[in-house]
Amino acid sequence: MLDAQTIATVKATIPLLVETGPKLTAHFYDRMFTHNPELKEIFNMSNQRNGDQREALFNAIAAYASNIENLPALLPAVEKIAQKHTSFQIKPEQYNIVGTHLLATLDEMFNPGQEVLDAWGKAYGVLANVFIHREAEIYHENASKDGGWEGTRPFRIVAKTPRSALITSFEFEPVDGGTVAEYRPGQYLGVWLKPEGFAHQEIRQYSLTRKPDGKGYRIAVKREDGGQVSNWLHHHASVGDVVHLAAPAGDFFMNVAADTPVSLISAGVGQTPMLAMLDTLAKEQHTAQVNWFHAAENGDVHAFADEVSELGRTLPRFTAHTWYREPTEADRAQRVFDSEGLMDLSQLEAAISDPAMQFYLCGPVGFMQFAAKQLVSLGVNNENIHYECFGPHKVL
C-alpha cells in the first residue's frame, strides 16, 4: 500500500503530465529503445511509428495517477493490458527495465527532484506488482488447460483461404499433433513472426473466428496498406509454413446464458471476433434472439457473407442486416446487401428493444463510437455494450 505522502506527491504531478501529454511517452519509448533495443523484438513498432502506443501509454499513466487512491477502479484496464501482455510473453524482469526508463524520463523532462522520483518509483512498483501477479495467474491458467502451453508453440498453416479482396483466413494445427486449448469466443491469438527480411520479430494479435474445436485455430487477416505482417501473411505465407503462437487471450469475449438476446455489430474486419461468437451461438443452439449487423464498403471487401448466412439458418431467432457504404453496380444487381450508406440502427429498433440484450461491437474506433452513440440514444444501457479495439485500447 502507498502512504498518504506518496499519493499526494504523485497526484501533484497530474497537471504537469496533462500539460506534457504524449510527448512524455514519446521520450520514454525513444529512451528505452535506445538503451534496450532488444525490446524492439516485443513491441509492435508500427504502433510506435503511428503514435498509437505512445498515446495509449500516456492515457494509462494519467489514469493511474488520477486513480491512485482508488486502484479497484483500474482493474478492468489492468485486466485488458495483462491479457495483451501474456500474448507478448512479458516477463517480470522487463517491468524493472520499464520502471528505470520511466523514472529517467520524468527526471530528464521535468527535473522534479528526488522526492517526486521516489514517490513515482513506489507508485510504479505497486502497479508493476499488480500486473506481474495477474499475468502469472494467466500464464498458469493457459499452461494448465487441456491442450494448453507455456511460451509459444509451433503451429503449421493447414489452410489459407481468400475471403474477400482484403481479407484472408488462416487455419493452424500444432506441429506436435496434440490438442489445443479452448478459448472464449471473442479472444485472440498471439502470432509471432520473423521471416527473412524482417528487421525485428513481429508479434500481432488476431481474433479467433470460430467456436473452439480442440484441433486447431482459425484467424482472418486484413491486408493493410503498408502493414508489414499482414502483407507478408497475404503474399508470402503458404500452407505448410510454421509459425509460433502464444495461447489465446483477451478480456473481450461473449458470456451469455441461452435465453439472453445478443446483437453482434461490426464493420470491416471487425467481424472476426463476432464470427466466433456467432459460430458458438449456432452450435449451442441459442434460443434467444441473435442479431448480426455488419457494415462494409461494398461486396468486394465483404468477407464471410455465406458463412454468416449458413450459421444464421441454424438459429431459431436470427436477424441479419448488412450496410454497404458504396455498393458496386454488381452489388446492386445481385442485391447482396440490405441498406446503402452508413449503419443506421434505428432501422432495426424493434430487434434491439429487449432490455436484457447484450451488444458486442468491433470495428474502427470511429465506427464503434458511432454505433454506441446510436444504441444509447435508442435506450440501451452502457453496461450492456461491450467492445474491442484492434490495436491500443481507446475509450468510446
Swiss-Prot record:
SUPFAM superfamilies: Ferredoxin reductase-like, C-terminal NADP-linked domain, Globin-like, Riboflavin synthase domain-like. The active site is at residues 95, 135. The record marks 84, 388 as: Influences the redox potential of the prosthetic heme and FAD groups. Residues 150-255 form the FAD-binding FR-type domain. Residues 1-136 form the Globin domain. It catalyses: 2 nitric oxide + NADPH + 2 O2 = 2 nitrate + NADP(+) + H(+); 2 nitric oxide + NADH + 2 O2 = 2 nitrate + NAD(+) + H(+). InterPro entries: Cbr1-like_FAD-bd_dom, FAD-bd_FR_type, FNR_nucleotide-bd, Globin, Globin-like_sf, Globin/Proto, Hmp, OxRdtase_FAD/NAD-bd. Residues 147-396 are annotated as: Reductase. One of its GO terms (biological process) is nitric oxide catabolic process. The record marks 29 as: Involved in heme-bound ligand stabilization and O-O bond activation. Keywords: Detoxification, FAD, Flavoprotein, Heme, Iron, Metal-binding, NAD, NADP, Oxidoreductase, Oxygen transport, Transport. Heme b binds at residue 85. It holds the Pfam family Globin. Its cofactor is heme b; FAD. Binds 1 heme b (iron(II)-protoporphyrin IX) group per subunit. Binds 1 FAD per subunit. NADP(+) binds at residues 268-273. FAD binds at residues 188, 204-207, 389-392. One of its GO terms (molecular function) is nitric oxide dioxygenase NAD(P)H activity. It comes from the Bacteria. Disulfide bonds: none annotated. Consists of two distinct domains; an N-terminal heme-containing oxygen-binding domain and a C-terminal reductase domain with binding sites for FAD and NAD(P)H. NCBIfam families: PRK13289.1. Is involved in NO detoxification in an aerobic process, termed nitric oxide dioxygenase (NOD) reaction that utilizes O(2) and NAD(P)H to convert NO to nitrate, which protects the bacterium from various noxious nitrogen compounds. Therefore, plays a central role in the inducible response to nitrosative stress. HAMAP family: Hmp (MF_01252). This is Flavohemoprotein. It comes from Salmonella paratyphi A (strain ATCC 9150 / SARB42). The lineage of its organism: Bacteria, Pseudomonadati, Pseudomonadota, Gammaproteobacteria, Enterobacterales.
